[in-house]
Amino acid sequence: GVIADLAAARQPVIDERGRPETPPAPEGGLAVQLAGIVWTLINRQLLSRDTGGLDVTIVNDIPDGAGLGDEAARGVAFALALLGDGDDLDDAPVRARIAEVCHQAAEMFSPVPPLRARYTAALRGQYDSVSVIDYADGSVTQAPHPQSGDLEFYAITVEQARVDRSAEILRRRRFVEEACRAFGTESLRLLPDASQRVIEWLTAVHKVHGEENTPEIGDAAAWLAFEERETERGLRMARALRARRIDDIWHLIAQSQSGLTGPYGLLGSEAMVQLCIVRGALGARAASAGNVEAVIAGVETRRAPNFTQDLADDGLAVIRLGRGRVAGLADAGR
């Protein structure tokens, strides 16, 4: 069928030099994305092949372009609805598998590069906690949520906030994926001296195959350095949250934002971040770098009314963030 053909077009092929060719970017609207979830669930043997046609209605109160993961929330909700008859939907291994399926479907059928952590947090998170996800081993632990009576968080966005830097995001991700394949590892974090060895590998690739469809050495080194430092910042952030040292998180957020728009080169949110700081935020960072210009900002509760009013006067949309809840099925009988 159509979905199977689209999935086949996304599979990597090997060129005459023995290197994987980059498949075309996914194309298709919401119907294709939802059908892709059905197709992936069937092929992963989570859904019967006898599944018939579907009439889908989606109710969504997440503002478009806010960078709050509405695509992931929609995909997870749809998958849970399809699997609603299962008795084990609350089991961690099952939820981990559903998150993997939803992320895989988004990679194949969504034009927006998905963030795997959003699917994991939606299905395996906990109320009142921040999910700490280790990509090296897939483990998920929880840290105390920083929101309190003295601290609020907001998403700040603007009309037409979506930006299309999908090609740049995919270019960085595919470089890391090719490096992982070259070294036979699922994560560069499992590779000793990863940055140095990957650069040596890339240099050899350039000498043998040329530089076509590969990053320049300087760009690759900057990306790897950012990934390494961002991982360290994530670990330090988790320790600060668990120790309830909230004052320690703001410089980590600032460093992360600086790295995104500097060495990593995903521009688009820096002006909004600076405006939030000027208006009184303790810290702010891109909500979904390269996809939207929205940011997430933390503000002292006593300053929140002036902060939100000033940004509203600037023509921005300001959305107060709660702590959320884990994805689940509502009782249709209520």
Which ranges hold each PLM region?
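C-terminal nucleotide
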Residues: 1-28, 132-286, 296-334
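Short glycine/threonine-rich catalytic loop with a Thr-x-Gly-x-Asp
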Residues: 68, 286-287
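Catalytic DNA-binding helix-loop module of base-excision-repair DNA glycosylases/AP lyases
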Residues: 293
